[in-house]
Every structure is written in C-alpha cells, then in structure tokens.
C-alpha cells in the first residue's frame, strides 16, 4: 500500500525468497515488479537513507534490526498509524463482521443481500484470502475502495489487531468460543478483548444474543440477534423457510440451506435491516442463496455416497453439523486439527465418537508441512464408542480415499476440520483428489 502511495519501499528479511511458502513468494515477486525493493537473505540490513520503518509486531526489541532502528531514532509506523492510513483511503461505509465461528458465512450472506438490493459491494473475506488484511490492502491498491457503494469485511482477530482504527458503520459479532487461545497466552479474556475492539470501532453494534453478557457491560445500545431467543432480531427456522421478527414487523422467506446457515442468515438480515435494506430485497437474496464453498457443501455423489465438505472445527460448530446428520450413516474424515493454534484433539474425538461409527483422521500438519501421526491418534484414542472403526492416515488425500473402503451406497461421507479455513484451495484440491482415487479403487 505504501508503494502505491508513491513511497519508496524496501522489504528486508533474513530469510531468502526460497524460504517462504510458494504463495508468499508469488506475492513478493509481484511487489518487486511493482517497484518494491526486496532485500532478502540479509542478516544485517542498513538503515541509511531510511525515513520511516514498519516492523512486524512480533519482532522483539532484542532483534539486531530493531536495535538499529532504535539507535538511529527512526520514526516507526505503528499499527494505529497504518490503520488510519487505510481508513482514510476507504470513502464508503464499512460493515465489519467478526466472531469465532460463522464470520465467513455471515459475510458472504450479507454481501449477497446488499448485492440483491442494488449496492456495488466490495467484499473481503477469508474465502478469497486467508489473510483478510492482505485482501483489503490489495483492494485499495486495485481501486476497489473507490469503485463501490459499500464495503463488507470479514474481520478475523488478526485483522482487527492490525486495522483497529477503521471507522465501522455497523459491526457484527457472531459469537465467541475458546479458540486461538495459544495466541493470547491461553487467556480467553484477552481473546475476547481483541474481538471487542470491533465494538469500539463501530457506530452501530450488533451481536449474537449468546454474547450479551460480555457486550452489555461495555455498550448499552447494542442490538442482538438469535434463533428463537427474545431479542431485537429473532429468527425461526422452518421446513425450507426462515422467519425473521424485529421491531418493525416480520417476514418469511424460502430458504434452501441447512444447519448453521439459519442463524448466520438472521445475523446478516439484522445488519441489512439496520442499514435500511428492504424486507423484499432480503427475501429475494435469501430465497436464492445456494451456500458457499466448503460450508456444508454437497460436492456430489460418488458410488452412491453423498459427499459433504464442511469447515466446522470448533466443538459447537461440529456439534451442529453432526446433529444435522444424526439420522444418517456417516463416515467421517478429519483434518489435522492444529493450524496456527493448538486445539484440544481429545475433545474432538469424544464428540465425534458420540455420532459416527467410522472416523478417519489425518496426521498431516498443513502449517509446518509435517506428518504428525500423534495428532491423529490423539483424536482417535479419545473416541469412546467401542464399535467405532478408527483409522489414522498420513494426509487428507489418503483419508478421503479410504472413506470408500469403509462406506456403502446410501452413506454420507462427511469432512470436517480447520484446514479449509486455513487454506481452502489447497485443501479442497487434496480432498477431491482423494475422493476420485478412492471411488475408483474401492468401487
């Protein structure tokens, strides 16, 4: 972004270009084409001729480059400075959506509603780029901020920490659950406080009713939404329909999605209604909504088995998905459950064992690109169902293929885990490869 604003930018890092992941290498090469100077593989970069410095928040004061910057008394661009720059470059209203679960889905549905209402929407979510802050900056550089009527941003906790000075017209909190705590010293309170930065940034704030106990003490004019709870926006799920009641009336829309899509659609509707979108436009959008990739997505039938890809990986989200399929015979295959955060894999095993009789767990860690079979066994060893078939595999492709060995026509093959949220394109590609191989090998 600084390069786009006609500053001369140098990126320095002790790592060589080849040390970065392939997607990061591509981004760095593109930056170089656009005029950014890459000073990589340099353990002792010079600060001569430098006016200002931006340093990664994780860089310790003891790092050699940090000491050089301090000794030279250079101006340091803080996250607050950077966030204000970004805010000044976005001339339209911003809707910001955060939460532990449901933020990607809710962002997608909200975007669909506003597009149906005729708005030219600039939408950024982890569905397109796992690092949403990168997507926002990329959009500014490409002129999207100047070529829209409204911006709708998914705001994960990392993005909120970086862009905490955005002026948000309406902020929405879907929920807060125990996840990512390893990034906050194991403290749920610190994680909650990071999420609550959105409340401070927002002119109007809406939260799931489950969060009322942490929102009410800091904001007395917040609005709340939920399924079947007494609050400002009340949703009621029916057979292929959704009813929303609020202070100005109610409406019922045909709705062809399932499971957590109901509550997320109530959240999206609450944002739209608060902003002034009509019931008619919301109804049209929700009645036509067909879901989004890898969120309770039916990817087809293979050898008489319906295959569903879901990105649920936290206890509550997984339970919602498993409850939906409780009357079906399900063969379940799972990711390695650690990404940037360490997770309780025994809790996963105990939960899934209550619902399914075949559990196949992958031991491949996509973050460090290592096979960690202990992670798969930790899930499987916690399964208390004595009749369960438990299989550990070296990667998700093998896991997907083996689902056909342990299933029969009429069964549901279900995927769950965090890797789709971490790297959707790579993970789905590996899964689809396994499904193709398994359907042929075990037909």
Descriptions of predicted regions:
Residues 8-13, 121-123, 152, 224:
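Short beta-strand "acidic-cap" motif of Rossmann-like dinucleotide-binding folds
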């Amino acid at each position: 972004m600084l390069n786009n604003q006609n500053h001369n930018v140098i990126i320095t890092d002790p790592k060589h270009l080849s040390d970065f992941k392939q997607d990061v290498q591509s981004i760095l090469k593109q930056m170089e084409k656009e005029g950014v100077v890459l000073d990589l593989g340099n353990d002792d970069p010079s600060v001569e001729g430098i006016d200002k410095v931006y340093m990664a928040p994780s860089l310790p004061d003891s790092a050699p480059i940090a000491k050089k910057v301090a000794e030279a008394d250079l101006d340091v661009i803080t996250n607050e400075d950077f966030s204000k720059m970004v805010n000044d470059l976005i001339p339209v209203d911003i809707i910001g959506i955060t939460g532990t679960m449901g933020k990607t889905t809710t962002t997608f549905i909200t975007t669909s509603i506003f597009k149906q209402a005729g708005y030219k929407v600039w939408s950024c979510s982890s569905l397109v780029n796992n690092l949403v802050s990168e997507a926002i900056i990329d959009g500014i550089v490409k002129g999207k901020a100047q070529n829209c009527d409204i911006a709708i941003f998914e705001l994960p906790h990392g993005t909120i920490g970086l862009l905490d000075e955005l002026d948000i017209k309406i902020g929405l909190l879907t929920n807060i659950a125990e996840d990512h705590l390893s990034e906050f010293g194991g403290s749920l309170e610190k994680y909650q406080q990071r999420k609550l930065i959105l409340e401070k940034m927002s002119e109007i704030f809406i939260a799931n009713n489950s969060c009322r106990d942490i929102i009410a003490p800091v904001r007395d004019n917040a609005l709340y939404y939920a399924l079947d709870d007494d609050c400002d926006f009340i949703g009621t799920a029916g057979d292929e329909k959704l009813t929303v009641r609020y202070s100005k009336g109610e409406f019922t829309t045909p709705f062809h999605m399932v499971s957590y899509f109901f509550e997320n659609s109530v959240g999206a509707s609450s944002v739209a209604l608060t902003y002034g979108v009509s019931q008619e436009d919301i109804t049209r959008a929700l009645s036509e909504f067909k879901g989004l990739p890898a969120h309770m997505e039916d990817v087809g039938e293979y050898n008489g088995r319906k295959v569903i890809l879901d990105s649920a990986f936290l206890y509550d989200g997984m339970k919602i998905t498993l409850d939906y399929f409780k009357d079906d015979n399900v063969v379940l295959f799972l990711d390695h459950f650690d990404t940037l955060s360490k997770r309780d894999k025994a809790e996963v095993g105990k939960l899934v064992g209550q619902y399914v009789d075949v559990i196949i767990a992958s031991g491949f860690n996509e973050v460090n690109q290592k096979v960690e079979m202990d992670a798969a066994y930790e899930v499987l060893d916690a399964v208390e169902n004595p009749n369960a078939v438990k299989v550990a595999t070296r990667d998700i492709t093998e896991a997907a293929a083996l689902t056909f060995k342990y299933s029969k026509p009429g069964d549901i093959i279900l995927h769950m885990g965090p890797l789709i949220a971490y790297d959707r394109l790579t993970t789905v590609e590996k899964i689809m490869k396994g499904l193709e191989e398994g359907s042929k090998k075990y037909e």
